[in-house]
């Protein structure tokens, strides 16, 4: 299981959105990803997210609407 991949469901651990569920939408480099879902879409340091064992089916750079639909279909929102 690759922990850091597009579609991986994560929990924010730091910041004002700590505790919220999010999804990795794009991997930028070894330290940063773009997240969306239960949080505002933004670049995030990997040290600030905790990957879970859940994954939703998403394309790279999926829109916010596509992310919300995928989370609803998986019963995570």
UniProtKB/Swiss-Prot annotation:
It comes from the Archaea. GO terms for biological process: ribosomal large subunit biogenesis; translation. GO terms for cellular component: cytosolic large ribosomal subunit. Keywords: Ribonucleoprotein, Ribosomal protein. GO terms for molecular function: RNA binding; structural constituent of ribosome. SUPFAM superfamilies: Translation proteins SH3-like domain. InterPro entries: KOW, Rib_uL2_dom2, Ribosomal_eL14, Ribosomal_eL14_arc, Translation_prot_SH3-like_sf. Signal peptide: none annotated. Belongs to the eukaryotic ribosomal protein eL14 family. NCBIfam families: PRK04333.1 (NF003320). This is Large ribosomal subunit protein eL14. It comes from Methanococcus maripaludis (strain C7 / ATCC BAA-1331). The lineage of its organism: Archaea, Methanobacteriati, Methanobacteriota, Methanomada group, Methanococci.
């Amino acid at each position: 299981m690759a922990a850091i991949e597009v579609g991986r469901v994560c929990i924010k651990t730091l910041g004002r959105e700590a505790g919220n569920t999010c999804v990795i939408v794009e991997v930028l480099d070894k330290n940063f990803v773009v997240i969306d879902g239960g949080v505002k879409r933004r670049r995030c340091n990997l040290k600030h997210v905790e990957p879970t064992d859940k994954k939703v089916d998403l394309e790279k750079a999926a829109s916010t609407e596509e992310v919300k639909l995928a989370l609803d279909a998986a019963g995570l929102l």
